[in-house]
Amino acid sequence: MHAYTVEPLYVKSGQEVIAADFYRPKTEEKPAVIVMAHGLAGLRQFKLIQFAQRFAQAGYAVVLFDYRYWGGSTGRPRELVSIKKQLEDWRTMINHLKERKSIDSRRIVLWGTALSGGYVLDIAAEFKNVQAVMAQVPFVDGAESAKLYPLQQLPKALKLSSQDYMGGKVGMSPTTLPVVDPRELCFLPTQDAYLGYRSIINPDYYWSGEIPARLFFNLIRYRPIQNVRQINIPVLFIAAKHDSLIPIESSREAATNIAPFVQYHEWEMQHFDIYHASWFEKAISTQLEFLHQHIGVR
């Protein structure tokens, strides 16, 4: 097991500043680096630190960051989820690490979960200087995920999304929707999503539980599955067979389209199980084995 340090890292993205934690093994002169960020509306303290710690103990550097508008990063309105800007944040972090002398910029690995799992697949299809990708329960097809949304609630959600988008154009305060709610209109309306999301929240960090509704329409249109055929680096893809937010058929199709570069796992779990107990241990063990196979510690 490697000893490591954790240092704050701040990187400019557009007019704002991204806040990150930089985990650096003490025993590795120029380690490979794993870049990590959360999925929909998540802070880096929401069960991602446990992954980062295990990677660092195994000898890998880790950069775990919050998107603009979130957590320790700057930007207003707070808690805005912009797919376009979050993808820009991933590119910014990768470009920053390419110039950083303390890590091996030839060995950059992307790690994403849920929505950020879709991001890292998208980025891997675009960037040619990334060496591997790990995507757990990735969001791969918004159009297919939308079919799991309660049909009677969809028109209202789309209307609020449109109103918030137009309001944002003229400087109005955001119209928000809860991320999860057991009874009211929200982004993730299933019962297991409500319980699952509540299980990853860290009460020591501010989180309102609501985000601007303008995201809803863009989320439906976001389809990383359309780009994954362009990926030609090793991909670890972990899917949840009983995921109520991401159709398992979409995960299977995406993995098929990445072949022969994909190592696909389909486990008998729900979307949020992977952050907890035995599923977390299985996930981190699988991810470390994948890293050992394709990246390694020198």
Locations of regions flagged by a protein language model:
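N-terminal cap/lid segment of alpha/beta-hydrolase-fold proteins
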Residues: 1-29, 83, 277
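Catalytic nucleophile-loop/oxyanion-hole region of alpha/beta-hydrolase
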Residues: 14, 44, 70-105, 277-283
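The serine-hydrolase catalytic nucleophile loop
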Residues: 40-53, 67, 249
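Conserved alpha/beta-hydrolase
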Residues: 54-74
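Alpha/beta-hydrolase-fold enzymes
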Residues: 121-201
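Short beta-strand/loop motif that positions the catalytic acidic residue
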Residues: 231, 237-239, 243
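Conserved alpha/beta-hydrolase "acid-adjacent" motif
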Residues: 244-250
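Catalytic active-site module of serine/aspartate enzymes centered on a nucleophile-bearing elbow/loop
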Residues: 267-298
